[in-house]
Amino acid sequence: ACNKKDCWVSGIMIDLNGFKQINDNYGHAEGDLALCIVADLLRKSFSEYGVVTRYAGDEFVIMLNTTDDQLIQKIIKSAKKNFVTENEKNDKPYQLSASMGYAITNLSNETIDDFMNRIDEQMYQDKMKYYEHNDRRKSK
């Protein structure tokens, strides 16, 4: 919420894990289908809480309508569960998953560029945790 002194915002940066391997192993048409599935999952997971946008390639940004840290963590956890559910029900030879990073800021104290860099860094930290436990070369 913004007023003359403060402008609090929150956002989530999302990047698909292993998307290049989907394109390389199964073709760009399958990669495009995977992006559509992910976009639908993200809309279902986040539309109640903000606006989902495709940022670049396999990256998405959600600008949230809440700055409640616990709620943001809860909806990220729920979104990751939605990916697991999607993988269980589809018959794809690969797993869909995403790394997610978020931040809450007062734009009176931080530029939007710095904010975007911060959520990108948080997403990168999540991606490092993902790849510590998942070998990039494995598929379903």
Regions of interest found by a model, annotated:
Residues 94-99:
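PAS and PAS-like sensory/regulatory domains
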Residues 63-65, 103:
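Short hydrophobic/aromatic beta-strand micro-patches
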Residues 3-10, 17-47, 53-57, 61-62, ...:
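Conserved long alpha-helical elements within nucleotide-processing catalytic cores of c-di-GMP signaling
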